[in-house]
Amino acid sequence: MTNIRKTHPLMKIINNAFIDLPTPSNISSWWNFGSLLGLCLIMQILTGLFLAMHYTPDTSTAFSSVAHICRDVNYGWFIRYLHANGASMFFICLYAHIGRGLYYGSYMFQETWNIGVLLLLAVMATAFVGYVLPWGQMSFWGATVITNLLSAIPYIGTTLVEWIWGGFSVDKATLTRFFTLHFILPFIITALTATHLLFLHETGSNNPTGIPSNMDMIPFHPYYTIKDILGALLLILTLLTLTLFTPDLLGDPDNYIPANPLNTPAHIKPEWYFLFAYAILRSIPNKLGGVLALLLSILILIFIPMLQTSKQRSMMFRPFSQLVFWTLIADLLTLTWIGGQPVEHPYIILGQLASILYFLLILVLMPTVSLIENKLLKW
């Protein structure tokens, strides 16, 4: 008798995606982050659902409803901080996943890569609108500053900003629509994730060598299910440690002050995971130029497959490319640090240098070094 998991229409999909899926035998722990992102998404949807049961998207009660969740709802504080720190874990996994893709040449699966970039944009949008919901000082001013950037668009800018605000400033209408968007976007992300997996399973996974591994495949279960469970346990341990010991470590103290349109915080800054892009935005004195640089800092990922000049897919055997890659990581960490600093000397010039280096590394140095390595192969 044939196994039900191989015949039943629904079970067959699950079987082909998570059980009998042929997987390269040599993929490392860097391939764990895909499943961890799935876990983060499920966790965020569940904690978000319970928070939405008690939250009120109204300017007069939003802040106190979050306080009510933390004080009066059973384990409300736990759910709230799991959700807030879960977002941080989500972005850590996301950036590690993208870094893995860059290092091992996974971007050569173009459809999978492009849907991944769309997913990144959707997650960033979700995190941004979600940060506005507690209606603290940083929520309000973050929303005001970032939405205001759209006014840099010629002709339609001002109209567009007022259309997003639903008025002439960030107010009740803005909060309501941001809550709506924050609720719907995770489901769009889930649909995109399914598409991402669909395209990945058309080609099969890449592996650390970048060499086709069709002749050396093993079933996903039990080998990689157990490996993913280990990753999941480490993720949960890290998240629980963060949530139970230092829940506010990654947050901003200003967000414990109710939103006040008449009082601007000394340093307006987004959550840590947007700081690198914020530093690039601030490093250009011109408003439109800054907005374009901000957009390009993320959308540059779409052009990565076109910039591939190496004869080898992975960086595993390319020491010079590895050097450029780790310089890029160091540069991104520098930008993240600068994004959290006030706009004054020496941070301004450091931010400008780090921003120039960011684009230089991706657009010029990576392709050039790859060409040099191609020449070295012939020696």
From Swiss-Prot:
PROSITE patterns from the UniProt entry: CYTB_CTER (PS51003), CYTB_NTER (PS51002)
Lineage: Eukaryota, Metazoa, Chordata, Craniata, Vertebrata
PANTHER family in the record: CYTOCHROME B (PTHR19271:SF16)
UniProt subunit comment: The cytochrome bc1 complex contains 11 subunits: 3 respiratory subunits (MT-CYB, CYC1 and UQCRFS1), 2 core proteins (UQCRC1 and UQCRC2) and 6 low-molecular weight proteins (UQCRH/QCR6, UQCRB/QCR7, UQCRQ/QCR8, UQCR10/QCR9, UQCR11/QCR10 and a cleavage product of UQCRFS1). This cytochrome bc1 complex then forms a dimer.
Organism name: Pseudorca crassidens
Membrane topology note: Multi-pass membrane protein
Function statement: Component of the ubiquinol-cytochrome c reductase complex (complex III or cytochrome b-c1 complex) that is part of the mitochondrial respiratory chain. The b-c1 complex mediates electron transfer from ubiquinol to cytochrome c. Contributes to the generation of a proton gradient across the mitochondrial membrane that is then used for ATP synthesis.
Annotated binding of a ubiquinone, by residue: 201
Molecular function via GO: metal ion binding; ubiquinol-cytochrome-c reductase activity
Protein name per its UniProtKB record: Cytochrome b
Extra facts: Heme 1 (or BL or b562) is low-potential and absorbs at about 562 nm, and heme 2 (or BH or b566) is high-potential and absorbs at about 566 nm.
CC cofactor: heme b
Residue positions binding heme b b562: 83, 182
Taxonomy, superkingdom: Eukaryota
Binding residues annotated for heme b b566, in chain numbering: 97, 196
A GO cellular component annotation in the UniProt record: mitochondrial inner membrane
Pfam families referenced in this protein's UniProt entry, alphabetically: Cytochrom_B_C, Cytochrome_B
Cofactor remark from the record: Binds 2 heme b groups non-covalently.
Keywords of this entry: Electron transport, Heme, Iron, Membrane, Metal-binding, Mitochondrion, Mitochondrion inner membrane, Respiratory chain, Transmembrane, Transmembrane helix, Transport, Ubiquinone
